[in-house]
């Protein structure tokens, strides 16, 4: 700022003071400019770092999005493990949120934008009202307050599971002038003279067999709350639980076999060999029934069976009494069972239906590696098959078969024509030839869905039932023993069936264990099934 000469003071000291003040102001301005320049440089550095990380995460996100979207040749959703994809999406979202928080912090105060509308929390959740009253201004002290409105917001909170002790007191009474004593009977419990309530047993079982939390981890978690329950004791409780629930699991398997179409699959379940301390390979077989895709009204369910082998004798024993469609992958045990039944002229006939998802995976690997144009063409055609399946899902069997005959059959015919031609062009030892032979040798089973609307294009229903058990297996390392494997199969049967029916497994199991302890009659076992569960009946 330049002052006119006339405005300058005549006094030397005053003039010096003015000059000194102007110098200080200039220095302060320069300091502010330097600080602003430093802040700009810092923000640019933060922005550059954020942009680099965003670009990296965005590239990952694009790859993941191709698992569900993209061109037909790029879609991967049937070849990628759903759990892996979900986990990757979660990690990307977490990374992006961290960057956004960093940018918000770097930007400091900024105008608040209008909040995005969001879906409210479920109505059944408990609401804890917290009213925050404003401070009364000094000049309004003593005046009457008039409520003219309020702002209301909700945040989701959690109360971690808390242990408590149920103290049961049963007073004894005597009557003057009369002999004897009266006292109420002790309530029945599944573990007599033991520590746990039925709800604690249910909580441990759901944590282990539904949520994949091994007993040794539960032991450590409970210790944080000062509760000492050893894993060996919990294992004993689970064994008793398996014994009590076996009848229910057997009943579900029988209900599964009443279906017109059953899905089957199997997965390994390592088990400790007696005496040696080494793990041996055992198997968890799964049999699922779900008629909803073709408009059926029967409840969905799954039954698991533990075996130390994987032979055809296992599946023959499990499916004794079943006659109908068996939808499976290409494993020979199922084929051998169907052939054996046909050879003996059994009334319990089995029609095998193939799984196009298993076949697709074989061609998908070749498509990704770029070694086979036929594989890429196959993937494109198969993607169209699944798109057509989306159109018929939930319709009745006749409508499904009609649309498949109209649109899908030509695609399937062209695929088998392509594979037959390609097989003569490639090396018999190549992966392409291996994939083609897999398809050609199972052609009848793979084509069966075209004429029967009850059949699905894949066996993903049972694969989804197997997946939670593979997660539990990974976390637990092994089943512990043959008895532990049987208990696993029994409890998992019931808890997974709960999930398939949209029932809270903890509420169902708590109620069911209480009823069993109280002597629920075996003749009314149907009322205990997850699909008949009524939450308001919990005691």
Curated annotation (Swiss-Prot):
Signal peptide: none annotated. Transmembrane segments: none annotated. Keywords: Plasmid. Pfam families: DDE_Tnp_IS66, DDE_Tnp_IS66_C, LZ_Tnp_IS66, zf-IS66. Belongs to the transposase 25 family. This is Uncharacterized protein y4qI. It comes from Sinorhizobium fredii (strain NBRC 101917 / NGR234).
């Amino acid at each position: 700022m330049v002052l006119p000469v006339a405005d300058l003071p005549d006094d030397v000291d005053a003039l010096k003071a003015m000059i000194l003040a102007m110098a200080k102001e200039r220095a302060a301005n320069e300091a502010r400019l330097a600080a602003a320049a430093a802040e700009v440089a810092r923000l640019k550095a933060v922005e550059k770092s954020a942009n680099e990380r965003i670009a990296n995460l965005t590239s990952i996100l694009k790859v993941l999005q191709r698992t569900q979207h993209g061109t037909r040749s790029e879609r991967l959703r049937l070849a990628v493990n759903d759990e892996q994809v979900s986990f990757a999406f979660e990690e990307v979202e977490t990374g992006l949120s961290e960057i956004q928080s960093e940018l918000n912090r770097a930007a400091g105060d900024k105008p608040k934008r209008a909040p995005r509308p969001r879906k409210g929390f479920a109505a059944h959740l408990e609401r804890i009202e917290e009213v925050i009253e404003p401070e009364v201004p000094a000049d309004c002290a003593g005046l009457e307050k008039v409520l003219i409105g309020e702002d209301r917001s909700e945040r989701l909170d959690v109360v971690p599971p808390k242990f408590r002790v149920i103290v049961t007191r049963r007073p004894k009474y005597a009557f003057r002038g009369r002999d004897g004593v009266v006292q109420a009977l002790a309530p029945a419990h599944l573990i007599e003279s033991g520590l746990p309530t039925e709800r604690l047993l249910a909580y441990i079982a759901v944590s282990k067999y539904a949520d994949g939390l091994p007993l040794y981890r539960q032991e450590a978690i409970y210790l944080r709350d000062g509760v000492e329950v050893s894993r060996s004791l919990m294992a004993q409780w689970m064994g008793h639980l398996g014994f009590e629930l076996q009848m229910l699991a057997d009943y579900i398997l029988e209900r599964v076999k009443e279906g017109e179409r059953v899905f089957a699959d199997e997965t390994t379940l390592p088990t400790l060999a007696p005496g040696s301390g080494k793990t041996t390979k055992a198997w968890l077989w799964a049999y699922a029934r779900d008629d909803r895709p073709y408009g059926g009204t029967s409840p969905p369910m799954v039954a698991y069976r533990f075996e130390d082998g994987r032979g055809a004798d296992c599946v023959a024993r499990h499916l004794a009494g079943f006659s109908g469609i068996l939808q499976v992958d290409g494993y020979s045990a199922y084929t051998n069972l169907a052939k054996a039944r046909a050879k003996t002229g059994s009334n319990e006939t089995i029609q095998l239906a193939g799984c196009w998802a298993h076949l697709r995976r074989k061609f998908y690997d070749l498509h990704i590696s770029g070694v086979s144009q036929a594989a890429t063409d196959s993937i494109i055609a198969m993607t169209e098959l699944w798109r057509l399946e989306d159109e018929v899902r939930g319709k009745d069997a006749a409508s499904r078969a009609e649309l498949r005959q109209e649109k899908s059959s030509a695609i399937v015919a062209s695929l088998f024509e392509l594979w037959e031609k390609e097989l003569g062009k490639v090396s018999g030892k190549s992966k392409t030839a291996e994939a083609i032979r897999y398809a050609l040798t199972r052609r009848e089973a793979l084509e069966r869905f075209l004429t029967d609307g009850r059949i699905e294009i894949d066996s993903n229903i049972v694969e989804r039932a197997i997946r939670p058990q593979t997660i539990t297996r990974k976390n637990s390392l092994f089943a512990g023993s043959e008895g532990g494997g049987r208990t696993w199969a029994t409890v998992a049967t019931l808890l997974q069936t709960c999930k398939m029916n949209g029932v809270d497994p903890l509420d169902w199991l708590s109620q069911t264990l209480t009823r069993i302890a109280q002597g629920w009659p075996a003749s009314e076992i149907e009322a205990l099934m997850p699909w008949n569960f009524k939450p308001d009946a919990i005691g």
